[in-house]
Amino acid sequence: MPRRRQYPTNADRQRAHRDRQRLQTLAPGALQRQIDPCTLYCAPAELLAPLLPPAGAIVTDPPYRVGLQGFDYTKPRRRPAQWTQNFAGADQDFDPTPWLRFPEVVLMGADHYWDRLPCGERAWSLLYWDKLAGTTPADFAPGEWIWLATATPPPPGVITHLWRGGMRAGEENISRLPQKLHASQKPMAVMRQLIRLTTACVILDPYMGSGTTLVAALREGRSCIGIDLDPDSFAVACSRVQAELQQLGLFRRGQEAALLSREEDESLLRGRDVLAAAVDLLTPALPDDLQP
Ligand SMILES: C[S@@+](CC[C@H](N)C(=O)[O-])C[C@H]1O[C@@H](n2cnc3c(N)ncnc32)[C@H](O)[C@@H]1O
């Protein structure tokens, strides 16, 4: 049996080889996983910034220092804490500079690094994600500011989506997802809403964590590139993307099958019409007094 070609053309194979070489020069030891149409890297994002397509849209939830002491995701609240340590970067100031050269940029948690955003230089806007959605304030962040510099930034507004500890709206509701996949996992519905505000074909998340942005991008029909320096997050993101693509594949195959069976139904109907016409033609006309 002939071997399946990994690359459609020689040029594609050469390009992939050049990309691998560039990757190893920029970040020796970086891992790369291609799960078409997604590329995932395990490496420090800042080193890989030059590899990213310049026309892509950055949609990311970066790590940043939360408060003076930092937010402790390992602190138990009602239930025992799920995480034994905070994720990388939660104790450092975030510098958005490497990502601001992209034509479309959506940054979550912007209230933690206001002073580094170029608020005078390009069209930008703000959205407030209201996480309490009308519930009583508790020991959880009431909301989060999102900074957007997109082709046509929307007017400032509010996204309401319940997200306080175990109380989560949408597909991450505790009945569907009892344990979160990442200490700072974001809701799929919110990420999809943000991606819809961008126009680029490729969505870039340099701090992908468990890969929520990538899955959201796939659901919005975009390709995506994600980076995380933590190998565990990288593994979770890879398996999420793979599972999503399988689902989408099954869904597409289901849609195609439904389309085929509709076409079959239609041709069957057309066949029946032809048959009925033929029967009409071949049946000798009954005398008028014997017509039913
Ligand atoms: C706030 S979390 C993202 C969570 C994600 N939105 C989700 O839904 O799962 C930030 C992620 O950035 C990663 N990170 C921190 N510093 C990084 C760096 N320099 N390069 C790449 N990833 C980094 C952390 O490991 C963490 O997984």
Label each residue range with its predicted role.
Residues 32-40:
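Beta-strand-turn-beta hairpins that frame and shape the catalytic cleft
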Residues 1-25:
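BZIP DNA-binding basic region
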Residues 26, 51-60, 64, 68-75, ...:
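Class I S-adenosyl-L-methionine
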Residues 8, 85-93, 181-185:
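Conserved phosphate-coordination/catalytic loops
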Residues 91-103:
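A short glycine-rich, Lys/Arg-flanked "PGG" loop and its adjoining helix->strand segment in the class I
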Residues 66-92:
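Mobile active-site "lid"/loop adjacent to the S-adenosyl-L-methionine
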